[in-house]
C-alpha cells in the first residue's frame, strides 16, 4: 500500500465497518512492516509519521491490535501479537533481555511468538511467563502443508506442528497456568528483571509480586523458597 493511499484506506475501513457489531480491528502490516515510498515522496521516517497520524482515526470506537509492534503504532493499539522474546542475533556474545516488555507491560498487552513454531515449546512457554506475555499459538483446522496442500501423512512434522488437535489439550493447560500467574498483573508495571543465578530468573512488578523462572534441570532454593526444575513460581 502506497503511503499516499493510507488516509483513503482508513476512510474506507471506517465506512465499511460503520454498522458492524465488532469493537476491534487488527492492523497487522503496519505493525511489522515499515518501508519507504519514494515514488510518492515518502522516506521511512515520513512513512512512520503518516501511519502514526492516521491510526487514531480507527481508535475512536474500536480497539486495535497489531503484529510485532513497530513503535509508530504502539501508542494507538491495545494489544501486540508476536512481540519478540529473543535477541535478533544468536551466539554466545548475545543475551536476550525483556527490554520491550519492561517498557510496555502495564501499558499495552502482548503475546509471544507462536509456541508451536518453537523448537522447544516448554522453554518458550516459561519465557512467556518470565516476560509477562500471553502464550500464543497458530494452528490449522485441517491437516495441511504450510503451502495449504492437504497432507496425507498425519504424523509428519508439518502436520504435528500446526494441526490444532495435536496442541489444544496442552495449550489449554498452559493458558490456565499463565492466566493464574499473570492475569491480575496485566495493569502492573514491570520494575525489575534479573538472572539471580545461572538459568534462574526473577521478574518483579510494582504490586510487589515476583515470578521466578527456573530453566535448569534441578530444583533451586532461593531464600527458603523452592522453585521446581523446568518450572516457575509466583510469590506475592
Task: Report the location of each language-model feature.
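Active-site-proximal substrate-binding groove within the catalytic cores of carbohydrate-active enzymes
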Residues: 1-236
Amino acid at each position: 500500500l502506497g503511503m499516499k493511499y493510507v488516509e483513503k484506506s482508513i476512510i474506507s475501513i471506517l465506512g465499511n465497518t460503520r454498522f458492524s457489531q465488532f469493537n476491534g480491528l487488527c492492523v497487522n502490516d503496519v505493525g511489522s512492516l515499515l518501508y519507504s515510498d519514494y515514488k510518492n515522496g515518502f522516506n521511512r521516517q515520513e512513512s512512520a509519521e503518516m501511519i502514526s497520524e492516521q491510526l487514531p482515526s480507527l481508535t475512536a470506537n474500536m480497539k486495535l491490535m497489531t503484529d510485532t509492534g513497530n513503535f509508530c503504532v504502539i501508542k494507538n493499539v491495545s494489544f501486540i501479537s508476536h512481540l519478540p522474546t529473543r535477541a535478533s542475533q544468536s551466539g554466545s556474545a548475545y543475551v536476550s533481555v525483556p527490554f520491550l516488555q519492561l517498557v510496555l507491560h502495564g501499558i499495552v498487552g502482548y503475546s509471544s511468538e507462536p509456541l508451536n513454531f518453537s523448537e522447544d515449546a516448554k522453554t518458550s512457554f516459561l519465557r512467556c511467563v518470565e516476560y509477562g506475555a500471553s502464550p500464543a499459538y497458530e494452528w490449522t483446522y485441517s491437516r495441511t502443508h504450510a503451502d495449504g496442500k492437504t497432507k496425507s501423512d498425519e504424523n509428519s512434522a508439518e502436520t504435528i506442528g500446526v494441526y490444532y488437535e495435536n496442541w489444544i489439550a496442552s495449550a489449554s493447560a498452559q493458558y490456565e497456568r499463565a492466566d493464574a500467574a499473570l492475569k491480575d498483573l496485566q495493569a502492573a508495571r514491570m520494575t525489575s528483571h534479573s538472572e539471580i543465578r545461572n538459568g534462574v530468573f526473577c521478574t518483579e512488578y510494582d504490586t510487589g509480586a515476583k515470578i521466578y523462572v527456573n530453566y535448569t534441570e534441578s530444583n533451586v532454593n532461593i531464600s527458603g523458597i523452592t522453585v521446581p526444575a523446568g518450572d516457575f513460581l509466583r510469590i506475592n
